């Protein structure tokens, strides 16, 4: 890429494939913090952290706070050590959902092929829309950026590429207010010197595993023997090899944005003891978490469902600071929700679920806090053992307690 031949702007570049690229990734810039700053101008030049409690984690840090080292999923006590002057605001997800709806309303006018990843990001397929809009995808997206900032008061960054993987990377190259493109011709050379954790799904454990066999850059993976990768990472190794060559066959699928994953069970006899209810709850959490891992998503909201003998349904929800795809976290939250219910009530059904998903594969393992990461590693290993030797191959202590 080179500077724009028309104006030579340092932030404007010319790209030979710009007129033909049609897969985009759009990401709001520090979304939650930006909404709060827009609504309270006195916060504009201050470091803002969205999160709750010293024992919680950072949900979002504004760019000023990030300059001090604060970042998403970091424990709050650590973030406040790095940025002691930060203004801490508890997340207001109802407000953020409304702003997300306004943004997606504008996206819907461009194309029906939109795959939301979370409240603040989405993949967009603009293939074949040139005649409809009288403009290339790049032109439409540039207009969309300006319109969102003008009408909603928030900024977004856009990545344009031939596939979802490259579009996601491109959107992160020039934040905030960024617009970057990665073409097919340059993809492999662009990726070659990047660290392996730029690839989706590569967290600290995979980085260490790859380093043990001398693979530290994306170029190393691209040049690696397929058998070596398969022996080390199984089918995941083959996937990383394709990505290292800039290849990604996934389509932008609006239907992939599943609304909820849940499991429930009805008792033969009504249960009222808290311990009995928890014993029934654990395998449901395992089932939900396993399904989330299989689909490559993590839920931001945990739900508990209860039905009383008179068939009244009680649903409780809690928004998590960090998305989860582990039974450990889902069970912990569902149990806390259950403990808030009046003791002594009888129930004929209990259920657990996750909703408001983010793409865990795209975000990578580093999106999770340390405890969540350890639980994820453990539960993924259990998945593999059960898949090979049967469901009874590994029985957890909680499951044994319920027997």
Curated annotation (Swiss-Prot):
GO terms for biological process: DNA-templated DNA replication; error-prone translesion synthesis; SOS response. Residues 23-203 form the UmuC domain. Mg(2+) binds at residues 27, 120. Its cofactor is Mg(2+). InterPro entries: DNA/RNA_pol_sf (IPR043502), DNA_pol_Y-fam_lit_finger_sf (IPR036775), DNA_pol_Y-fam_little_finger (IPR017961), DNA_polymerase-Y (IPR050116), DNApol_IV (IPR022880), IMS_HHH_1 (IPR053848), Rev_trsase/Diguanyl_cyclase (IPR043128), UmuC (IPR001126). GO terms for cellular component: cytosol. The record marks 32 as: Substrate discrimination. It catalyses: DNA(n) + a 2'-deoxyribonucleoside 5'-triphosphate = DNA(n+1) + diphosphate. SUPFAM superfamilies: DNA/RNA polymerases (SSF56672), Lesion bypass DNA polymerase (Y-family), little finger domain (SSF100879). It comes from the Bacteria. Binds 2 magnesium ions per subunit. Poorly processive, error-prone DNA polymerase involved in untargeted mutagenesis. Copies undamaged DNA at stalled replication forks, which arise in vivo from mismatched or misaligned primer ends. These misaligned primers can be extended by PolIV. Exhibits no 3'-5' exonuclease (proofreading) activity. May be involved in translesional synthesis, in conjunction with the beta clamp from PolIII. NCBIfam families: PRK02406.1, PRK02794.1. Belongs to the DNA polymerase type-Y family. Monomer. This is DNA polymerase IV. It comes from Caulobacter vibrioides (strain ATCC 19089 / CIP 103742 / CB 15) (Caulobacter crescentus).
